[in-house]
């Protein structure tokens, strides 16, 4: 008897226009965001699992894809999905060998019920060449707020971390999507609180802030965002 394998992924709606597929650990695959527009669908990251690739291929409207950065869990499904347009950073372009490089901010004006959409470069310690996407009150940052990993150490460059904090403070949004984080969507102020707490550990004369399993520790993530989780469950 043939065994049928379902390739259906759970799609979570944030509002009438924005939805996403959760990240997975096995295989490691990023959260993937879908944003409906009048004449197209924007897709933020394409993930690395078959279920996500299947859902992307179920979109028959024009697809505009933005890659947050070059890591495989965010870009792997490029090889098995189609798209009308692909937007990447200069660094990501070197790895995926395709796409339009985003040097200046891309702005798609508001149109009726569809809010303004922006794609822009965002500073990051985790990976060079990160792109962010904003639609209305939501900003999606991929892994941009995470640290660089060196063995068991998680390291932030002090100067880049300060740039990250400044950029987030200037964002006109209420929520931020952080790929792989518990719950995915967090209040802007909670993300700022966490990053500022990390910045508070800087030491005079040192350009790096280093932790053993800090930002990726589930207990830390749960502690920082437990209020968000409780409110969303009510």
Residue ranges and their predicted role:
Residues 3-59, 101-167:
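Catalytic core of the metallo-beta-lactamase
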